[in-house]
């Protein structure tokens, strides 16, 4: 189990943010399309418990490589940085994983799609996201 520490900020000038990241030493990484399906269930109150269950399908826009992961996110440990416990593992086929969850009673909520540009410096990862119908974000 790992602890995920993240801060999400809505941004108005994506290009300026990307230039600033480069100026302070971040190196551009992979560029991907992520499609996130979150789930609800009658038998588990994800919202009330501040938890999340997600299947993420990823397409690397540079290589065409595809992958998928299933993730459980525990309740936030810190509301400022959205720190939470996270369990994540690869799945061979995201569509099959989604179908399994739906057949055993999990209900998908609207899919969140985003184009994500990764940036790295030392042990820090920054992502600049263009989220469909929601805008641009720095994470």
Predicted segments with their positions:
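Strongly charged, low-complexity linkers/loops
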Residues: 120, 125-137
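N-terminal strand-loop-strand beta-hairpin
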Residues: 1-123
């Amino acid at each position: 189990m790992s602890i995920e520490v993240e801060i999400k900020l809505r941004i108005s000038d994506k290009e300026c943010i990307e230039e600033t990241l480069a100026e302070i030493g971040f190196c551009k990484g992979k560029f991907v399309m992520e499609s996130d399906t979150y789930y609800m269930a009658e038998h588990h109150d994800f919202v009330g418990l501040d938890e999340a269950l997600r299947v993420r399908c990823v397409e690397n826009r540079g290589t065409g490589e595809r992958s998928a992961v299933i993730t459980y996110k525990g309740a936030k440990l810190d509301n400022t940085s959205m720190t939470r416990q996270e369990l994540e593992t690869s799945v061979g086929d995201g569509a099959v994983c989604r179908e399994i969850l739906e057949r055993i009673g999990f209900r998908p909520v609207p899919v969140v799609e985003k184009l994500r540009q990764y940036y790295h410096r030392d042990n820090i990862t920054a992502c600049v996201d263009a989220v469909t119908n929601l805008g641009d974000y720095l994470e």
